Amino acid sequence: FVSVPVIIAAKSLKIPSIVHESDVTPGLANKISLKFAKKIYTTFEDTLNYLPKDKADFVGATVREDLKTGDKHRGYQLTEFNNDKKVLLVMGGSLGSKKLNDIIRQNLETLQESYQVIHLTGKGLLDNSYVGTKDYIQFEFVKDDLTDLLAITDTVISRAGSNAIYEFLALRIPMLLIPLGLDQSRGDQIDNAKHFESKGFGKTILEDTLTENELKTQLREIETNRDDIIKQMQTYKESFTRQDLFQKIINDALSE
């Protein structure tokens, strides 16, 4: 909502503004800003269905440039893992998810039959009783080393924020998405997750249906269909390079 007064002020000063919607369905701030903005760009093509045709353009996602520079050797050093077994990365979002953390730990022995597990728990949610456990390592949060961990990741369990899931897509990492529920959000992550599942990029479990059995079932589905999922991911191409998008912003802002 911080952007709304800025967009309104820009309009009053006759300064053109362009807003961006990263989720499938537009949020309230962008719905308000749209009345004063010249254009709105969307990450998802389906978002165009919710917006006026004369103002909305689909531009896709432009992921950060360093994403594909992760070092596998460094990733294995950080985790003390190896390439003998697949790596499962579990990300519960910046605040973590107690429910997801509990289910991962309760099913750790089963998961370890197929995976080495990197568990990003969220701040204050480490469990010291698991320190030193074979094929399992936990971090509260990882920033600078995340690209190295992604470089060794075969499958990811994650929330469904658009930036994160497009990064997994760019890296061709099959994903099991557990979006924030309606009790914690407006449902944007649910829409994002369902969209990605419909494209064949992975599977979705709603948080209120997250159980041990459902987790095992969906991970099994992903592994059974891994090759098909990756093939589907390979059909995705970025709509704009960073330079092309920069030029589009200039052209749209200056056009009459």
Q: Where are the regions a protein language model picked out?
A:
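An aromatic- and histidine-rich active-site surface loop
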Residues: 1-13
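C-terminal alpha-helical cap of glycosyltransferases
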Residues: 221, 239-256
